[in-house]
Each structure stands twice: as C-alpha cells, then as structure tokens.
C-alpha cells in the first residue's frame, strides 16, 4: 500500500511541487489496519515535499485498533492528531450500526489517548437512538476534552 501511495506522490510531483499541505488525513475506511511502518513511509514521502512544522496530520482509528504501541508509533512517525470513530457510547446503537467495538473498548481507547490530540466522531440518527442517548453521547465525549 505505501509503495502505491508514494508512487502517486512521485508521479504528481510536477503538479504539486509549489504546494504546501496544511493538513494530511488518513481516513475513510480503516487506515488503522495499516502498519505503522507503512504510515511512516508515506509520511516521510509527504513530509519531504509538501508539509511544514504546522501541518496537521490526522489518523482515523476504530477504538479496537488503539493500543499504546500503535499510538506511540504513529506519533513518532509524525501523526499529531487521532480521530476516534466512536459513533456512539451505547452498545445497542453500536450493534445497530454493525460496529465491531463496544462501549468498553471506547473507554479503554480514550484512556490510552488521554494525552493525545484527539477528536471523536459521533453519529446522529442511528436506529434505536433517542434524544436522551444522543445527549448522553455528547456528554461522554465532552469528558474527554
């Protein structure tokens, strides 16, 4: 995977040579399944051409994929923000979404990420969601801030 992305960067160099990226986002699907080594290779290629000290580099993760080792590796590779795909703190709602994580894994992931620049993705309008459960999701997310 990393080689294909780096190849695309190399082939696009003439188009992007004068550009500066203010943000880089690894998301859409499950980038957290990629190895830290692959992410580091991609970031090395990007950093050598397109980013600066203030570039925000975000990495989207499912709660089940968060581990101290993975987070430490991503931070060392240059990631400076984690986007955690919580969606809901209620197991019934997570089940309705077909998510593989549960509320316990969310809390464990948040504990690991407590000193990391983190955003949380929530969903509204989930089957079986109530106004009260969504309010609860918001409140539980605010605890992390």
Residue spans for each PLM region:
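Conserved non-cysteine loop/helix-boundary elements of the Radical SAM core domain that shape
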Residues: 1-15, 19-142
């Amino acid at each position: 995977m990393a080689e294909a992305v780096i190849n695309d960067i190399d082939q696009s160099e003439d188009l992007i040579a004068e550009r500066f990226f203010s943000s880089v986002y690894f998301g859409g699907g499950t980038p957290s399944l990629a190895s830290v080594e692959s992410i580091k290779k991609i970031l090395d290629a990007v950093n050598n051409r397109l980013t600066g000290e203030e570039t925000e580099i975000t990495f989207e993760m499912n709660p089940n994929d968060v581990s101290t080792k993975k987070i430490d590796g991503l931070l060392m590779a240059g990631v400076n923000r984690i986007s955690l795909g919580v969606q809901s703190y209620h197991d019934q709602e997570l089940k309705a979404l077909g998510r593989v994580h549960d509320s316990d894994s969310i809390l464990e992931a948040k504990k690991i990420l407590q000193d990391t620049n983190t955003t949380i993705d929530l969903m509204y309008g989930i089957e079986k969601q109530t106004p009260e459960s969504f309010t609860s999701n918001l409140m539980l997310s605010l605890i992390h801030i």
